[in-house]
Amino acid sequence: MAATPSLAIVLDGLSTAGLSTGCSHGVPWYVAHLGGQLLASLAEPDQSLSEGLADALERVAHLHPRCDLKNPGTPSATVAVLRRRYEVLDHLVLADSPIVLATNGDFTALTDLRVDSVLPEMRAEVEQHETHTPGHREALQRFVLAQRQLRNTADGYWVAAGDSRAAAHAQTGSTPLKEVRDAAVMSDGVSRLVTEYQTATWDDVFTTLRSEGPRRLIQDVRDTEATDPTGRRWPRYKSGDDAAVAYCQW
């Protein structure tokens, strides 16, 4: 996660499931450098978010030229960006880290769920197993291997990785600032409290953010996951996913 007074960025690195990536640096390195380069690329408010992302992707690629960036498992991440620009809010989402806007008593979730339509049978196979079991681990590796072949392709889904052309496939838009009370940019490890676990509503989420802040919200996620540590009630890839949230007020 990275932020300035006018910009909030959440990046969520994709799991390698223990498989090779063709990169000696790893996903945490990639996410950290992409965040820094994205902040730099968007320093000028008139730079479009998609152009800024493309520029950042190119810059990071140049930082590790000896790595195999064409490897389908090269380090990659989801991207969610919210920017205040004059009297509008610009947004960009690439993959499933959402931005949620609180607007006049309602909530608008901006997200890119193309990944959810990829290989549904293999996804279901993973979810048949409890986490931390050999069957789950093996099914997840098979799923990730197959998923990688569709990553950043017309028949699959798009993420930030070695090819800057992925930025052109991000979902973008703008909302008048006066229509939005506040907003949250988050990883899907947080949004699943609403979308998958269904133990809270967006109204609940924003009530927590307004009164107790992001730390309390993330603890709510962890407390919920602790009631189902092996994914029996809520089948998933891991017991607890990375959780990050930037709460935005103006």
Which sequence ranges carry the predicted segments?
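PP2C/PPM-type serine/threonine phosphatase catalytic domain
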Residues: 1-250
